[in-house]
């Protein structure tokens, strides 16, 4: 019979690897030096450290003249938050080549160029909020007058789009529609447009794809526009956008997929990369779990099984709120 002590104090093999270690505050003076320890801290800090390494590798390749086409996907709540300005900066600086987002990721960017969203609280009486006409996104408040103001701009924009479609004899794709929104912002809005993702995508000719363009306030405004005018001519084409998006992946020498959140943007990007044998680099930032079989929670390794991420790709998934980790990730890679 094995002695209890021998069971508890079982001999082990020695292993090689990175020692777990955190910053000793007497030895660090700036935040950047603290972040340098992340890959050695363990848990999700290590995943963030790995994401920094992957994105830096992509940036180094691009700086040396190698082609790595960067796809960025994000859900609407990312734009609801202060991450909007980080993404706009990335587009402005030429760090992103292709964007996929939801309808909210488009319209909230435009709305914020009109009036800001307001920091609120998670714990409020939501029935009272409704009575006051204040919408809540977590602890971010959006007074309904933002959407009233948005409609004032969208109706003349729709009229412009309708005339464009009549002149060219075919509908705009969703990415063309968003490009024209950027042009419209450039013409109609003031300095605040310079914090806008759509504006800089227009200026830098970065396509923004939105396969579910009507699933939000833009869809609401289209409904009002069509019902009030009896219009059945204004159409947004999503079918031809899938060709454009897929070909942007197919024609790239290498691709990197950076995805904040899950849902449609995540799948649109990795599915486009399926047609080229998978993306070469992938960084996921998510709070979704894989246990329910959802696409949002599917880890990169599951994407490998579908051919959407290459088996030898550099990839990592960070399980965290993107508002916590994305600013650190961008700062460390870009600065």
Swiss-Prot record:
Keywords: Hypusine biosynthesis, NAD, Transferase. Pathway: Protein modification; eIF5A hypusination. It comes from the Archaea. It catalyses: [eIF5A protein]-L-lysine + spermidine = [eIF5A protein]-deoxyhypusine + propane-1,3-diamine. Disulfide bonds: none annotated. Its cofactor is NAD(+). The active site is at 308 (nucleophile). GO terms for molecular function: deoxyhypusine synthase activity. One of its GO terms (cellular component) is cytoplasm. Its EC number is 2.5.1.46. Belongs to the deoxyhypusine synthase family. Catalyzes the NAD-dependent oxidative cleavage of spermidine and the subsequent transfer of the butylamine moiety of spermidine to the epsilon-amino group of a specific lysine residue of the eIF-5A precursor protein to form the intermediate deoxyhypusine residue. This is Probable deoxyhypusine synthase. It comes from Thermococcus onnurineus (strain NA1). The gene is dys.
């Amino acid at each position: 019979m094995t002695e209890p002590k021998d069971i508890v104090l079982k001999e082990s093999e020695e292993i090689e690897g990175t020692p777990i270690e955190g910053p000793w505050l007497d030895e660090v003076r700036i935040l950047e030096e603290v972040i340098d320890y992340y890959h050695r801290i363990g848990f999700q800090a290590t995943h963030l450290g790995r994401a920094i390494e992957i994105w830096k590798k992509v940036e180094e390749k691009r700086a040396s003249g190698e082609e790595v086409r960067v796809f960025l996907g994000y859900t609407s709540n990312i734009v609801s938050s202060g991450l909007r300005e980080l993404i706009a900066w990335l587009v402005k600086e030429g760090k992103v080549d292709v964007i996929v987002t939801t309808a909210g990721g488009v319209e909230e960017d435009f709305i914020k160029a009109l009036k800001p969203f307001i920091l609120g609280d998670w714990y409020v009486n939501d029935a009272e909020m409704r009575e006051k006409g204040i919408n809540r996104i977590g602890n971010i408040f959006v007074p309904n007058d933002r959407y009233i103001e948005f409609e004032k701009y969208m109706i003349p924009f729709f009229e412009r789009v309708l005339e464009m479609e009549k002149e060219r004899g075919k509908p705009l794709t969703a990415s063309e529609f968003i490009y024209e929104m950027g042009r419209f912002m450039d013409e109609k809005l003031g300095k605040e447009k310079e914090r806008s993702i759509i504006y800089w995508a227009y200026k830098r000719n970065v396509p923004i794809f939105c396969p579910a363009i009507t699933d939000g306030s833009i869809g609401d405004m289209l409904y009002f526009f069509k019902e009030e005018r009896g219009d059945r001519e204004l159409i947004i084409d999503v079918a031809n956008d899938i060709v454009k998006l897929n070909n942007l992946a197919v024609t790239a020498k290498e691709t990197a997929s950076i995805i904040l959140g899950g849902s449609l943007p995540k799948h649109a990007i990795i599915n486009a990369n399926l047609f080229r044998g998978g993306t070469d680099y992938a960084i996921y930032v998510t709070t979704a779990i894989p246990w329910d079989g959802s696409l949002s929670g599917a880890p990169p390794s599951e994407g490998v099984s579908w051919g959407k991420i290459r088996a030898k790709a550099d990839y990592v998934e960070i399980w965290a709120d993107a508002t916590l980790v994305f600013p650190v990730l961008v700062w460390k890679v870009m600065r």
